[in-house]
Amino acid sequence: MRVAVTGTPGTGKTTATGRLDTALDVAHLNDLVGTEGLYDGVDADRGSKIVDVDAVRDHFAGREDVLVESHLAHRLDDLDAVVVLRCAPETLATRLQDRGDSPEKAAENADSEALAIILSEAVRGHGADAVYEIDTTDRSPDAVAAAIQAVLDGDREPSAGTVDYTDYV
């Protein structure tokens, strides 16, 4: 099984996937990008690596039994399931600023969340029948992990389009 856990930065991907009890190899893409050199350069304005998506796809090509966690994980090929973590934009902006992001970066990510950018990309790339949307706003990390586990165990139906934050914009 090839699974992506994706979502706007700050939705809880790393925390939740760290609590899963799964036989899948859990890969934290943000770590791999640096250690494996899967980037083209650095964005001087944001201070972040510019991910080479083709290199990432090549890195995971042919690998089965893997769960990839990242805000870019939905861009991988041949995924069996894409779990998109969502969070209320106001809560997301607070989380991001609490962890040290600038107000501008937090606002940019909150706007992306309100517009469902990652969800839209996931559905466009993999179809609604492969996408599972989970709202993390009022859930504990353990509850989010349990919801992801339900997807892995086949106990949850696809749910793309069930969370709506467009009133934020």
Swiss-Prot record:
Coiled-coil ranges per UniProt: none
Annotated spans, NMP: 28-51
A GO BP entry: ribosomal small subunit biogenesis
Highest taxon in the source lineage: Archaea
Region annotation LID: where it falls in the sequence: 98-108
UniProt: ATP binding residues: 10, 12-15, 99
Keywords for the protein's UniProt record, in alphabetical order: ATP-binding, Kinase, Nucleotide-binding, Ribosome biogenesis, rRNA processing, Transferase
Enzyme Commission number, as recorded: 2.7.4.3
UniProt enzyme class: transferase
Catalyzed chemical reaction(s): AMP + ATP = 2 ADP; ATP + H2O = ADP + phosphate + H(+)
GO molecular function, a single term: adenylate kinase activity
Family matches, as SUPFAM superfamilies: P-loop containing nucleoside triphosphate hydrolases
Keyword S-adenosyl-L-methionine set for record: no
Subunit structure: Interacts with uS11. Not a structural component of 40S pre-ribosomes, but transiently interacts with them by binding to uS11.
HAMAP family, per the entry: Adenylate_kinase_AK6
Family: Belongs to the adenylate kinase family. AK6 subfamily.
Functional summary from the UniProt entry: Broad-specificity nucleoside monophosphate (NMP) kinase that catalyzes the reversible transfer of the terminal phosphate group between nucleoside triphosphates and monophosphates. Also has ATPase activity. Involved in the late maturation steps of the 30S ribosomal particles, specifically 16S rRNA maturation. While NMP activity is not required for ribosome maturation, ATPase activity is. Associates transiently with small ribosomal subunit protein uS11. ATP hydrolysis breaks the interaction with uS11.
Protein name: Putative adenylate kinase
Origin organism lineage: Archaea, Methanobacteriati, Methanobacteriota, Stenosarchaea group, Halobacteria
